[in-house]
Amino acid sequence: MLEFLDVVDVERIGGTLSRDFEVARVVREWQGRGPVIVYRVEGCPQDSASNLLDLKFKLYKALGVGSDEEAYLKILDAMSSPARPSVVGAPRLREAEGGLMEVPAARFYEKEAGLYLSSAIFIACYDGVCNASINRVLVKDKRVGVVRVVPRHLWELYLRAKSRGQDLPVSVVIGVHPAIMVAAASSPRFGVFEVDVASKLLGNLWVYESPVHGNPVPLGSAVVIEGLLSRDMAEEGPYVDVIGTYDRVRNQPVLKVLKVYLM
């Protein structure tokens, strides 16, 4: 993330923003105006950043391209011929005693179910298959969330674990280079690891083994949440989705948080 902030304009928002609607208001006010915004959310010891990919030129900078065509071709190439990242030793991390209450979950719209992490990247490895995907998390308390998991590759790994009476170990990262977000939002075939896709997009990527599960997580991730995508289910939603309407309430897997680490 930090290396990306060095190549774009950054606007620092003063003060501390309330989780209830103020984060949403500020993000909306600055959307499409150019800068990435950096701000502090109440209860969080770290800065947060938003509007990293709200304009096309930021996507170009993140991918190192100069046009839509170059972006498409680079993403397609990375999905078809991903590259293994370099494995390094784990950095010094600080355990967040407040758990999920120390990460920048916020409420964006009045009828939403509660505080949300809107774009957390879940990394899971099971049965020799690794996956990284973006999922929203409804924060219930410092050790519990509910995760919207669409029926794709993470769901497949979850069902495999569940069929054996197991919870799925997951490492959830927040605050990464936007090229990693692009890779996590892509759709390679099952078995292609999106972190490898990100490594190809960036030319190289450094990862380390997460402290609890040993999952490969990108070096420099601002937050690493070690948890279990459990067999327990709970209501998730409503939540305003990408088309601006309230997504319906569903029973979804409960995230049981084991540890939260901050850079």
Model regions: which residues?
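Extended, highly charged
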Residues: M1-Y239, G244-V254, L258-M263
